[in-house]
Amino acid sequence: MWTAQSIPQGFKNPHNTKAGTWAKLKIYQGELRFAFLDEAGVVQSEHIFSAEQQPPFIEPQAWHKIVSTSGDIECQLQFYCMPQDYFYKKYQLSPTHSEILAATPYLQGGRALDVGCGQGRNALYLNQLGQQGFEVDAWDV
């Protein structure tokens, strides 16, 4: 949880999210003045957000900054990505194999065995697919 005193300075300067990463700022208390920018740092739009008027998801690679906050601000930042990128972004595993991604729309879930799984990137992806997910046994040889 950030307060007016603990918001990192980098978020008050122009910055953008990484490719494939969405940001979501949740405001619990107070107000925050926020600007969307172009790549040159020119303000494209400015908004005031609060607990009643939450900021939208910030698109990947969108330039933005926190302009100012009220003294009582309490907020928290979370990052989101596509399921196939999660373990790559969070744990630096190699990306999910392209053939697994191509087959995903046709899979119904169930059980899977991943022999020679390495660090488990494909098994982890298949396991996280929710209702269509797999119970996966993974063995590296």
Language-model-derived ranges and their functions:
Residues Y91-G109:
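Conserved alpha-helix/loop element of class I SAM-dependent methyltransferases that forms part
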Residues E135-D140:
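Conserved SAM-binding motif I beta-strand of class I
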Residues Q119:
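Conserved SAM/SAH-binding loop
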Residues P60-P83:
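Ligand-binding loop in jelly-roll beta-barrel domains
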Residues A40-P60:
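Short acidic-glycine-tyrosine-enriched beta hairpin
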Residues G110-G116:
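Conserved class I S-adenosyl-L-methionine
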Residues W2-A19:
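Conserved short histidine dyad/triad with adjacent acidic residue
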